[in-house]
Amino acid sequence: MRVLILRCGQAAAELVLPATLHRSAGVEIFSLPAVPARGDLKFLSDHTTELLPVDPTPSLEEIQAQPRVEHQAAPQLAPQQPVMPLRIIVLGSDAALSAVLTRLMRADALWPQIGFVPVTDAARDDESTAARNWSLPTDPAAALKLALTGEVKPVPLIRNDAGQAVAGSATITQWDGGAMTGEIIVDDATLV
């Protein structure tokens, strides 16, 4: 298995990682901005292409062209069979995790395993909504151990109107902050 550890932001860069990680074969550690931009994450495509040179699954365009697409129901493990598994572990905020997921989604490469170590800004006393939603440990050492060795559990990926992955939470508001009238539709079901 190849493991990419993405240290997003100063607080994540200051986290002390086990010495064994620095010497482990197949583990690469990257220091990135607190919320990495598309250009900061280009290297992810190099890794996904190397480990899965040809993706046998239909592209988004091919799926959209089909007259009937099966309902997906519950999330499942990705069907792709890479040369070796790839686990990407994000150390950082919910926004950093969203940025990484967005990059993978836009590259049509959502097959790697994703781990998350919530690293919050102590000065702002932030809490990771993603960690709370997924019952992840908030202690960085425990979260890192789970991210490195835990069992993969597929979860749905939610994106906003701008095509960005939402990790944690999002709000729906009017541009001016006023009352909002409308409805939320997921597939064929009206939620609100």
Task: State each model region's role.
Residues 2, 86-87:
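Structural motif
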Residues 9, 30-46, 50-82, 91-98, ...:
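Catalytic core of DAGKc-family lipid kinases
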Residues 17-18, 101-103:
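Short amphipathic alpha-helical segments
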Residues 1-24:
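N-terminal amphipathic/basic leader segments beginning at the initiator methionine
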